[in-house]
């Protein structure tokens, strides 16, 4: 009797375990599904437009990339270009999409702040992976826009259609013209994201790049017989250095000139004029180093940016240098030139990039490598 009771009890315990396991299976399965769903959502989480060109190659074939590419088509103006300072990765509601459509005829297409050429790079990556005709059509319209916008002398204005004021100057500021030229160079050289571009456009892109290089060479600033670097803007007719906003004076640019030299060093078979332009600019960068200081952000409230002495600091370069004296210059919204960044108002001191270390990579790595390839045997001091 006792044995039979124990046997029954054992059966009941096994049945209980099976029942509990049966209850747990859907719970565990739901937990796993939730975990996988969370991972999928995290992987496909919306991104900011600032990060749109920083994604892994395969991401440009994702549904999120397709959504953003379609946003870019929505934002593209009838001119073929795009406006600036808009987060075009934001999910467009029906109302917002309707508002965007109303701006199609706006004349705010620009190459400032990465606009237009950045959208085109994105579209090219998506089209390469997905092959959707609407993305190709949008990109080709963008290429046509850039080709139309170029001045006869090879430069590009900040806005096209032309916007009166400093916007019509040839604009190196913030990589504007160099961003355009890098893209057109990729088109002309049949790089993998642009192999679908027709031969006629490729040929026109190549000629536009050649004209742009000619413009750069002619615009290089000569001081007392020596070639130096470039201003952030140059006059669209005379090619002389030109001012822009109140705090952006005629000057030698320590920042924008870096991108120009990097582009010139990318020319496969540079002629003597290009080589001379590069070597002259590099010599200027070496002479314009600001040593023994750091440009730091304070920890107080409000935050401030200050120059502090530090003999062990790596070299810096000022954003702008006075052409005749080669002294760093700074300015506030009153447009008065100062020789110390501490002398301008807090708003401009903290709201603008007055120093850069970008030329360090040029001097320490890129130029020596270029020199070894183009001028073997020449020693870089």
Language-model features: locations:
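Long, hydrophobic/aromatic-enriched structural stretches that serve as scaffold segments
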Residues: 103-130, 138, 142-145
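Intrinsic, low-complexity N-terminal interaction/targeting segments
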Residues: 82-83, 87-88, 96-103, 152-163, ...
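Terminal, non-catalytic domain-edge segments
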Residues: 39-68, 186-211, 237-244, 248, ...
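Bacterial N-terminal signal peptides
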Residues: 22-31
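Eukaryote-skewed repeat-based solenoidal scaffolds used as protein-protein interaction platforms
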Residues: 136, 140-143, 147, 164, ...
């Amino acid at each position: 009797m006792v044995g039979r009771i124990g046997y029954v009890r054992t059966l009941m315990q096994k049945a209980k375990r099976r029942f509990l396991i049966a209850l747990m299976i859907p719970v565990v399965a739901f937990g796993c599904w939730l975990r996988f769903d969370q991972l999928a959502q995290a992987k496909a989480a919306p991104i900011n437009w600032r990060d749109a060109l920083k994604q892994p190659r395969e991401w440009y074939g994702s549904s999120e990339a397709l959504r953003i590419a379609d946003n870019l088509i929505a934002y593209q103006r009838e001119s073929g270009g795009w406006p600036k300072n808009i987060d075009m990765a934001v999910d467009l509601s029906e109302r917002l999409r309707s508002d965007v459509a109303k701006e199609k005829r706006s004349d705010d297409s620009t190459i400032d702040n990465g606009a237009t050429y950045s959208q085109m790079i994105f579209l090219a990556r998506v089209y390469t992976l997905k092959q959707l005709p609407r993305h190709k059509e949008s990109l080709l319209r963008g290429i046509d826009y850039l080709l139309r916008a170029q001045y006869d002398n090879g430069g590009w204005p900040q806005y096209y259609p032309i916007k009166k004021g400093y916007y019509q100057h040839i604009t190196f500021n913030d990589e504007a013209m160099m961003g355009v030229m890098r893209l057109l160079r990729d088109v002309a050289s049949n790089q993998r994201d642009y192999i679908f571009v027709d031969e006629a456009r490729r040929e026109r892109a190549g000629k536009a790049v050649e004209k742009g290089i000619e413009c750069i060479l002619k615009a290089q600033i000569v001081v007392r017989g020596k070639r130096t670097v470039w201003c952030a803007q140059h006059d669209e007719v005379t090619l002389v250095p030109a001012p822009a906003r109140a705090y952006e004076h005629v000057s030698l640019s320590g920042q924008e000139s870096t991108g120009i030299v990097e582009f010139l060093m990318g020319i496969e078979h540079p002629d003597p004029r290009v080589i001379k332009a590069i070597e002259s600019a590099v010599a200027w960068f070496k002479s314009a180093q600001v040593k023994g200081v750091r440009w730091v952000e304070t920890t107080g409230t409000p935050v401030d940016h200050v120059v502090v002495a530090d003999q062990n600091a790596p070299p810096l370069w000022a954003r702008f240098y006075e052409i005749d004296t080669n002294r760093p210059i700074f300015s506030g919204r009153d447009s008065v030139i100062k020789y110390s960044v501490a002398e301008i108002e807090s708003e401009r001191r903290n709201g603008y990039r007055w120093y850069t270390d970008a030329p360090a990579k040029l001097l320490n790595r890129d130029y020596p490598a270029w020199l070894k390839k183009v001028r073997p045997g020449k020693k870089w001091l």
